[in-house]
Amino acid sequence: MTADDRIKLEPSWKEALRAEFDQPYMSELREFLRQEHAAGKEIYPPGPMIFNALNSTPLDKVKVVILGQDPYHGPGQAHGLCFSVQPGVPAPPSLVNIYKELKRDLNIDIPNHGYLQSWAEQGVLMLNTTMTVERANAASHAGKGWQFFTDRIIEVVSEHQPHLVFLLWGAHAQSKQKLIDATKHLVLTSVHPSPLSAYRGFLGCGHFSRTNKYLEQNGETPIEWRLPPL
């Protein structure tokens, strides 16, 4: 499998990740997904949306990286951006807590939807470290090869340009810290925004205002975290 026209991938990412498509793990991952589909399993997000994080945020446009774990596994939720859901789908509990922190931190009213596409289009790379999942089976595709691909994405972003902000929420995201050059970038960590942990430090972390302050200090336009209405 090579990075050719069969893979709908934004050109800067296709070039930066070209070698990954020739790696043995990618062949194994492709075969695993083929077998899952052949067995009649429903896989999320839908095929054209798997690389939405990369296609929405070209490499040269990345300012902020938010790491998630794996896609939502309910019907109609996942569309390739971590924490985000498709229009018309209620915001899941972790995203509700993200909104609560935005309200506390920047006084941004909580929106009536969970579609974070506008963040991606401003330069927020919203990357799940496992990019697919079986319906109603959380973490079912963990350890199948995506981790090698997304580790390389994190390394490429860290190497490519200085003065990015990495938001690492929870132990899984923080396990990727070793891939990031902290001398070039701002790395902000907290517990996960899940209702199980958000009260232990996510609510009150101030990550959104701190992100924008760092971007402005380094000559970048801040992120407009306020989502447009749908």
UniProtKB/Swiss-Prot annotation:
It is found in: Cytoplasm. It catalyses: Hydrolyzes single-stranded DNA or mismatched double-stranded DNA and polynucleotides, releasing free uracil. Keywords: Cytoplasm, DNA damage, DNA repair, Hydrolase. It comes from the Bacteria. It is an enzyme of class 3 (hydrolase). Gene3D superfamilies: Uracil-DNA glycosylase-like domain. GO terms for molecular function: uracil DNA N-glycosylase activity. Pfam families: UDG. The active site is at 70 (proton acceptor). GO terms for biological process: base-excision repair, AP site formation via deaminated base removal. Its EC number is 3.2.2.27. SUPFAM superfamilies: Uracil-DNA glycosylase-like (SSF52141). One of its GO terms (cellular component) is cytoplasm. PANTHER family: URACIL-DNA GLYCOSYLASE. Excises uracil residues from the DNA which can arise as a result of misincorporation of dUMP residues by DNA polymerase or due to deamination of cytosine. Belongs to the uracil-DNA glycosylase (UDG) superfamily. UNG family. This is Uracil-DNA glycosylase. It comes from Pseudomonas fluorescens (strain ATCC BAA-477 / NRRL B-23932 / Pf-5). The lineage of its organism: Bacteria, Pseudomonadati, Pseudomonadota, Gammaproteobacteria, Pseudomonadales. The gene is ung.
